[in-house]
Amino acid sequence: FRSRDIMLNDAGIRLAELTGEGMKDIDFDLVISSPLIRAKQTAELVMAGRHLPMITDRRIIELSFGDWEGECVRDSKVLPPDFIDKFYNDPYHCMRAPGGESFQDVLKRTEDFYQSLVQNKAYENATIFISTHGAAGRCLLANFYDDKEDIWRGGIPKNCSVCIVEVKDGVGTVLEKDKIFYDEAE
């Protein structure tokens, strides 16, 4: 959740290290991260030893839960049942948390981020690693599909899952979705 800007725990650190090992043969030119500590830390661990420039961008920060920040959606006794149901099953129509954002808000700001990358000639042939969060990442990925309402696209992504996308002539294609570089049984 956004306002709880927490560091990765030991398990998160391990997943980021394993993901970095799995991606070691990919030549990246740039890292763009959400400004939240856990996203920056993930990027640093995945890209360890590469000495790449990192830019932070608030447009890929996680969905704000506003007054409900810090509540675990799955286990909450505070969140309205309709909110929980829509969050998992129809996030596009999920109500905005009081003082927070809707998924549609996040779709708009991640679309702006996506368009800024696509339209920037400096990134035309660049391989960019983007470190973001579950909801923000899925909203960013929606730019590659016609149907923007199917946000989760089969489920909430696992920690450190990777989507590989390609943009040619302004058209984005998802090459791989939710690839993981670790054994889930660990």
Regions found by a protein language model. Name each.
Residues 18-84:
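Phosphate-coordination/substrate-recognition cap region in phosphate-metabolizing enzymes
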Residues 27-29, 124-128:
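Short coil/turn segments at beta-strand junctions that form active-site/ligand-binding loops
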Residues 45, 139-143:
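Active-site signature of alpha/beta-hydrolase-fold catalytic machinery across serine-
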Residues 63-77, 119-126, 142-186:
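Acidic, low-complexity terminal tails and accessory targeting/binding regions
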Residues 126-132, 136:
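Beta-strand elements within well-structured catalytic alpha/beta cores of enzymes
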Residues 38, 136-137:
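Alpha-helix capping/helix-boundary segments
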Residues 84-105:
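Short glycine/proline- and acidic residue-enriched helix-loop micro-motifs
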Residues 1-41, 99-110:
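Loop-to-helix element that buttresses phosphate recognition and phosphoryl-transfer chemistry
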